[in-house]
Amino acid sequence: MSETKRVRVRYAPSPTGFLHIGNARTALFNYLFARHNDGDFIIRIEDTDAKRNIADGEESQMTNLKWLGMDWDEGVDVPGKYGPYRQSERQSIYEPLIQELLDKDLAYKCYCTEEELDAEREKQKANGEMPRYSGKCRHLTKEQQAEKEAQGFKPSIRFKVPANETITFNDMVKDDVSFESNGIGDFVIAKKDGIPTYNFAVAVDDHLMEISHVLRGDDHISNTPKQILIYNAFGWEPPIFGHMTLIVNESRRKLSKRDGSIIQFIEQYRDLGYLPEALFNFIAMLGWSPEGEEEIFSKEEFIKMFDPKRLSKSPALFDNVKLTWVNNQYVKKLPLNDVVELSLPHLQKAGVVSAELNQAELDWVHKLVSLYHEQMSYGAEIVPLSEMFFADAESITFDEEETAVLAEETVPTVISAFKKELEALEVLEAAEVKAAIKRVQKETGVKGKGLFMPIRIVTTGEMHGPELPLAIEVLGREKVLNRLDTWLKNN
């Protein structure tokens, strides 16, 4: 392909499911490559497998790509001169090209039933052979074909794979890759209903849409020789291919939609209150890295830096700890009002704050969220982080370490004195709480951890957490006194 040819890349999802983290990465790398080269980024919907398509699959793809911060130059919602951009609307384009291959004797009609093909595959497996079509229908005469059709058999169309050829291409990630044609077998390019198969439709669409580079997952690499053969059959120049390594989990296994340890879909991250800029940043580093040690970049910086030569040849590790860290870096930079906006729906969904808040209640939520602003990684995390603020005194339990602290003989004296100090305060404010703790220290002679730790454990139910006077202010006078009183009655 000429190096001066305009860069045109595509993300071509099938609407058979929602936007998955792996597909999002494919889209994102294509987007960055297009924008870096002042080229075109195209969204094409590959929806020819009608049985597997789901109602909201296409919408999920588009909505969540936009949410992540991507836009495109052509697609089902951005008309261009290379449309239609749904494969289901391109049947009239495919049919004459399939006929052209038949006319050139580069394809043939196959009347084999699924049962026959299954039996053939099983026999090959039993013999230790690689399953591939035997070519049974390749040499049928016109008369034999007519006889099959008279018997009611509908043909699929198979591509005639040339024998004894080596198909080689230079991959942007893997360098030179070769396949032997003898290992491929004649493959179907149109099903019995006339609908083209994936490999045929993709090759045709990529050519007619003038796609210059095909950047996709490693799981597609076995499709590439078939697509190159189709290009060669029509005398077309193939695009430049690049196959990204797969994403793996912490066990180094391919990321699977059945893997419950990792959230798989962009919509789920969105619903949990992750920031799109943070997720964009994290995904962009899955199998690609810039020079240097820095890991936080803006979209504009990624566009400026992106070079497919820096795509990793090793599988990309999906690191949940890194994901949390990256999101936290972005949350920390947000103004408090934005973090409250991110958190509030989750507090309401959990039922710990009302759906309709007055100003005093909203002010309280601001105070609550401010305690965890530096710690939070995503909106929904506010619920487990702040659960101590909503627990009843009777439901608070202490672990072994906390129980050991509360077993010290000075603890009842400290708790009793602190309760007395708070009862004298009409309003609990952090400064007043701090002063009250100092007075307890003076009165009891207990200081340091022996003073602060029992007060923290009894009032918050936790050994560690936000600054104690602030936490007590947010808890409120009634709740704190109730917890102190409950502990004293039980000990």
Curated annotation (Swiss-Prot):
Its main location: cytoplasm. Its cofactor is Zn(2+). A motif ('HIGH' region) lies at residues 13-23. It is an enzyme of class 6 (ligase). It is found in: Cytoplasm. Zn(2+) binds at C110, C112, C137, H139. Belongs to the class-I aminoacyl-tRNA synthetase family. Glutamate--tRNA ligase type 1 subfamily. Its EC number is 6.1.1.17. Binds 1 zinc ion per subunit. ATP binds at K257. Disulfide bonds: none annotated. A motif ('KMSKS' region) lies at residues 254-258. This is Glutamate--tRNA ligase. GO terms for cellular component: cytosol. It catalyses: tRNA(Glu) + L-glutamate + ATP = L-glutamyl-tRNA(Glu) + AMP + diphosphate. Monomer. The keyword Lipid metabolism does not apply. GO terms for molecular function: ATP binding; glutamate-tRNA ligase activity; tRNA binding; zinc ion binding. GO terms for biological process: glutamyl-tRNA aminoacylation. HAMAP family: Glu_tRNA_synth_type1 (MF_00022). Pfam families: Anticodon_2, tRNA-synt_1c. It comes from the Bacteria. InterPro entries: aa-tRNA-synth_I_cd-bd, aa-tRNA-synth_I_codon-bd_sub2, aa-tRNA-synth_I_CS, aa_tRNA-synth_I_cd-bd_sf, Glu-tRNA-ligase_bac/mito, Glu/Gln-tRNA-synth, Glu/Gln-tRNA-synth_Ib_cat-dom, GluQ/Sye. Keywords: Aminoacyl-tRNA synthetase, ATP-binding, Cytoplasm, Ligase, Metal-binding, Nucleotide-binding, Protein biosynthesis, Zinc. Catalyzes the attachment of glutamate to tRNA(Glu) in a two-step reaction: glutamate is first activated by ATP to form Glu-AMP and then transferred to the acceptor end of tRNA(Glu).
